C-alpha cells in the first residue's frame, strides 16, 4: 500500500511537467503557431434530407457532407491545416465548423516561419464550395452553378488583408454566411501576440455571432 502511494506521489510532478513542456513549444524564436476557424451557415431551398454525417480532412483543407449538402474548404497559401470538423443541422440549414487544435495537443501542428506568416497575411485564400448532393432533375432546381452575390460583405478589423474568402455555391443554396478567423495559438502565452485576422461573407443581413453560438457535433 505504501509503495503504491509513493509511486503515485512521484508521478504527479512529472505529469504537471509534461503539460508545461508541451506549451514550451511557444518559446520558439524561429516559428509561429497559427490556428484557424472557419464557420459556414448554408440555407437550402427545401428541408434537409436525413443523412449520415461524413467528413474528410486532407492537407490544407477539409470537407463535410450532411443533409444533402457538401461543404468543402481549401486553404490556399495559408500554411494551415484543420484538425476537427463539426456540424449542426436545423430544418433547412446546415452549420459547419472547421478548426485547428492547439500545437501542444495534436500532431502535425500548424507551424510556420516568419516569411510564411508574411505570405499568409498577403495571399491566404479560404476557398469555400457548396455542392448539392440531391437529384438535379427535381422540380425545385434553380440556376445551376450560379455564384451567390453578397448583399453585405464585411472585413472585420484588425485584418488588413482584404477578402480572404472565395465562395461558390450550387443551385440548391438560398443563402450562405461564412466567417474566417486566423489567430495566434500562443497568444495567451507569449508576451506579444500576432493580431487576429478575420473575414466575413454573407448573402443576408446578419452577424458572425449567430453562427458562433451554434452547438456543433463532431463529424
UniProtKB/Swiss-Prot annotation:
Taxonomic lineage of the native organism: Viruses, Varidnaviria, Bamfordvirae, Nucleocytoviricota, Pokkesviricetes
Stated induction or repression of this protein's expression: Expressed in the early phase of the viral replicative cycle.
Protein name stated in the entry: Protein OPG170
InterPro entries reported for this sequence: Orthopox_35kDa, Pox_vCCI-like_sf
Gene3D superfamilies on file: Major secreted virus protein (2.60.240.10)
One Gene Ontology cellular component annotation held by this UniProt entry: extracellular region
Assigned protein family: Belongs to the orthopoxvirus OPG170 family.
Pfam families: Orthopox_35kD
Cellular location(s): Secreted
Keywords, in A-Z order: Early protein, Glycoprotein, Host-virus interaction, Inhibition of host chemokines by virus, Secreted, Signal, Viral immunoevasion
Amino acid at each position: 500500500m505504501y509503495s503504491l502511494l509513493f509511486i503515485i506521489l512521484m508521478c504527479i510532478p512529472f505529469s504537471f511537467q509534461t503539460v508545461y513542456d508541451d506549451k514550451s513549444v511557444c518559446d520558439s524564436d524561429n516559428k509561429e503557431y497559427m490556428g484557424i476557424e472557419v464557420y459556414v451557415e448554408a440555407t437550402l431551398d427545401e428541408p434537409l434530407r436525413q443523412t449520415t454525417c461524413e467528413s474528410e480532412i486532407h492537407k490544407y483543407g477539409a470537407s463535410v457532407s450532411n443533409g444533402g449538402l457538401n461543404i468543402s474548404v481549401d486553404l490556399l497559401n495559408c500554411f494551415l491545416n484543420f484538425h476537427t470538423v463539426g456540424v449542426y443541422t436545423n430544418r433547412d440549414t446546415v452549420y459547419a465548423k472547421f478548426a485547428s487544435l492547439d500545437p501542444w495537443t495534436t500532431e502535425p501542428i500548424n507551424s510556420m516561419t516568419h516569411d510564411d506568416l508574411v505570405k499568409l497575411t498577403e495571399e491566404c485564400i479560404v476557398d469555400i464550395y457548396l455542392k448539392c448532393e440531391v437529384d438535379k432533375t427535381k422540380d425545385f432546381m434553380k440556376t445551376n452553378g450560379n455564384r451567390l452575390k453578397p448583399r453585405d460583405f464585411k472585413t472585420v478589423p484588425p485584418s488588413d488583408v482584404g477578402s480572404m474568402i472565395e465562395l461558390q455555391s450550387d443551385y440548391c443554396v438560398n443563402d450562405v454566411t461564412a466567417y474566417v478567423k486566423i489567430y495566434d495559438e500562443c497568444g495567451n502565452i507569449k508576451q506579444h501576440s500576432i493580431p487576429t485576422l478575420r473575414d466575413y461573407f454573407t448573402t443576408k443581413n446578419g452577424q458572425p455571432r449567430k453562427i458562433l453560438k451554434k452547438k456543433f457535433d463532431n463529424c
